[in-house]
C-alpha cells in the first residue's frame, strides 16, 4: 500500500483514517524523512503500531547515508519554502536512489531475515541496472559500477576520465548511458 502516490505532492498528503488502519497492520513503513512528510508522525501515532514507529524494526528512513544537498545555512522565509535539513527529493538523482534502495533493503532484511538472499539479489539487480543506464555497459564492464559510483559521488568522475586512457583514447570516449547522452550539455548553463 502506498500512502503518497507518485502523482501526489508528498509535502501535502492529506491523512485519511484508512491510512492509519493500513499502518496498524503494516510490517514496514518507508519514509523519506527529513522534513518532506510533516504529516507522518501524527499518522503513525494514530496507527499505534510500534513496529512502524520511529525506532521500530519496520520503520525505514530513506535518507540515511545519502549526502544531502541544498542544506541551508539559516532557515528563514525570505527564500520561500526551504527544507531546513536539506533537499529531501532524493530520488531525482540515480546514485542517491541506489542508496535509498540499500536503506530499504536493510529494513526489509530486518523485518524478514529469512528472505535476505532475495532482497540482496533484488538490490544487486537494481544497482546494476542503474549503473549501466547511467554510465553505459562498456565502462561498467571495464571499471565496475561501484568504482564509477564512488568517483561520481566524490565529484571526481570527470577528473578521473581526464587522466585515463583505454586503447590509446581518452577514457571519456567510452562513456555511454545517460551521462554519455548528456555529455554535450556538461558545463553549459541550462534553463529548464
Language model features with spans:
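Extracytoplasmic metal-acquisition and chelation regions
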Residues: 1-192
Amino acid at each position: 500500500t502506498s500512502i503518497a502516490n507518485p502523482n501526489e505532492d508528498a509535502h501535502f498528503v492529506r491523512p485519511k483514517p484508512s491510512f492509519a488502519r493500513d499502518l496498524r497492520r503494516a510490517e514496514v513503513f518507508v519514509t523519506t524523512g527529513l522534513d518532506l512528510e510533516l504529516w507522518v508522525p501524527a499518522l503513525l501515532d494514530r496507527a499505534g503500531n510500534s513496529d512502524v514507529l520511529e525506532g521500530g524494526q519496520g520503520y525505514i528512513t530513506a535518507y540515511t547515508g545519502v549526502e544531502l544537498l541544498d542544506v541551508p545555512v539559516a532557515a528563514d522565509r525570505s527564500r520561500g519554502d526551504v527544507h531546513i535539513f536539506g533537499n529531501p527529493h532524493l530520488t531525482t538523482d540515480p546514485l542517491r536512489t541506489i542508496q535509498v534502495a540499500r536503506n530499504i533493503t536493510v529494513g526489509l532484511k530486518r523485518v524478514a531475515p529469512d528472505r535476505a538472499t532475495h532482497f540482496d539479489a533484488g538490490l544487486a539487480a537494481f544497482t546494476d541496472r542503474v549503473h549501466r543506464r547511467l554510465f553505459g555497459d562498456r565502462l561498467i564492464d571495464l571499471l565496475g559500477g561501484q568504482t564509477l559510483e564512488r568517483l561520481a559521488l566524490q565529484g571526481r568522475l570527470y577528473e578521473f576520465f581526464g587522466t585515463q586512457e583505454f586503447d590509446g583514447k581518452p577514457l571519456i570516449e567510452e562513456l555511454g548511458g545517460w551521462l554519455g547522452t548528456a555529455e554535450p550539455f556538461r558545463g553549459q548553463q541550462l534553463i529548464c
